[in-house]
Amino acid sequence: MTKARKALDKYRRVVIKIGSALLVDRKTGLKKSWLDAMCADIAALRAKGVEVLVVSSGAIALGRTVLDLSAGALKLEESQAAAAVGQIVLARAWSESLSTHAIVAGQILLTLGDTEERRRYLNARATIGQLLRLGSVPIINENDTVATTEIRYGDNDRLAARVATMVGADLLVLLSDIDGLYTAPPHLDPNARLLETVAEITPDIEAMAGGAASELSRGGMRTKIDAGKIATTAGCAMIIASGKPEHPLAAVEAGGRSSWFAPAGSPVTARKTWIAGQLLPAGSLSIDAGAETALRSGKSLLPAGVRQVTGSFGRGDTIAIIGASGREIARGLAGYDAEEARQIAGKKSAEIAVILGYAGRAAMVHRDDLVMTAPSGGRLAEESDEGKGKLHA
C-alpha cells in the first residue's frame, strides 16, 4: 500500500536542496530577499519540532560573480577558485539570515568519499547528528574546491539524496525552477500532465525524465529521478517543487504544484535490511546473555557485554554479533576497530577514555547501526532438536 502524503511539519527530519538559480542572480549576485524568506520557512518548520538540513548550491555561481569571471564554461581550476570564494560568501549569507531567527548555521563540505566510504560516512553522519542535537541547521554542499571531474557527485540532487539516506531523513525536498514531474515536457506538449503522486519509480517514470542526452535531462529532471531512486529506496519520501515563490515551503504547504514520491519503507527498516542482507561480516563480537537481552529490547551494544572479539575489522565495517548460545543473533556496523574493541571488551563505557586515551563512543555498536538476524528465545533450534529426537526414537 502506498503511503499517504503528509504535511511538511509532520515529518521528523527534512533535507531541503536548493538550486543555484534560486539563490544567485548572474548579474546582481545573492538574492537576499529570497534567502531571508526561505530561512523564515525553515524557522517555521523548526518551531514545530522538525529537524532541517539544507543542501545549498550557489558557491561557484557566487564566486564567479565576485571574481567577475567571464560567461561561458569554466576551466576546472577556474571553477575550483570560484567555489573557494563563493563558499565563504554562501556560508556567511546563510548564517546571517538564519541568525535573525536565533538559529545557528553549520557549514559542511562533502566529497564523494564521505558518503561512499563507510568510515568517512560514519564520521560525517556523526558530525551532522551532533549539529542537529545542538539545534544547528547544517548547510551542506559539495567541496568543489577539491572535487575533480572524475571524482564528484556532479549535481546536488544526488548529493542531497545521499545526505538524506545518511542521516535517516524521512523527507527530501528538491527546490529548483522545476515544479514537478510531467508526463511529457510541458513546453513542448500542451497535453502534458503533472504527476502529483508517484507511488514507485518505474521504467515508465524514468522515461518521462528523459535519457542522459535529452533536452529534458539537461533541465535537471533526470538527476532528480536518480535522487528519487536513492531516497525512496532508503525509505525517504521526496518532493519536487518550484522554489521560485518567495516562501517556497509555505507555497508547497498551501497546495502549490509539486510531485510527491512515496517511500519504499521507513528509513530504519530499509537501512537495516541493507546491513543484514547485503554485507559480509568482517569479524564478530561474542556477547553475554545480559547484552543479548538488551539488544532484543532495542538497546545499543555496550563494551561491558562483549566477551570476545574475532577477526580484523575497521570502524564502520559490518560485524556479526554472536549470542550466548554461540549462534549469530545480529549484525551491525562496528563503532571501533578490532584492536580497540579487544582493549575495551568487558569494560564499562566510562573506562573507554582511560583505556584508549580518547573519549570514544559509548556503544560498541549503536542501535541505529544494528539489526537482529535471529528470533528470540532460540525457538527454531529447539523445535529442530525435538524433531531430530522423534526421528531417532
Curated annotation (Swiss-Prot):
Keywords: Amino-acid biosynthesis, ATP-binding, Cytoplasm, Kinase, Nucleotide-binding, Proline biosynthesis, Transferase. Residues 282-359 form the PUA domain. The keyword Transmembrane helix does not apply. The keyword Kinase applies. It is an enzyme of class 2 (transferase). Transmembrane segments: none annotated. Its EC number is 2.7.2.11. InterPro entries: AceGlu_kinase-like_sf, Asp/Glu/Uridylate_kinase, G5K_ProB, Glu/AcGlu_kinase, Glu_5kinase, Glu_5kinase/COase_Synthase, Glutamate_5-kinase_CS, PUA. It catalyses: L-glutamate + ATP = L-glutamyl 5-phosphate + ADP. Its main location: cytoplasm. SMART domains: PUA. One of its GO terms (biological process) is L-proline biosynthetic process. GO terms for molecular function: ATP binding; glutamate 5-kinase activity; RNA binding. ATP binds at residues 17, 176-177. One of its GO terms (cellular component) is cytosol. PANTHER family: GLUTAMATE 5-KINASE, ISOPENTENYL PHOSPHATE KINASE. Belongs to the glutamate 5-kinase family. Catalyzes the transfer of a phosphate group to glutamate to form L-glutamate 5-phosphate. This is Glutamate 5-kinase. The gene is proB.
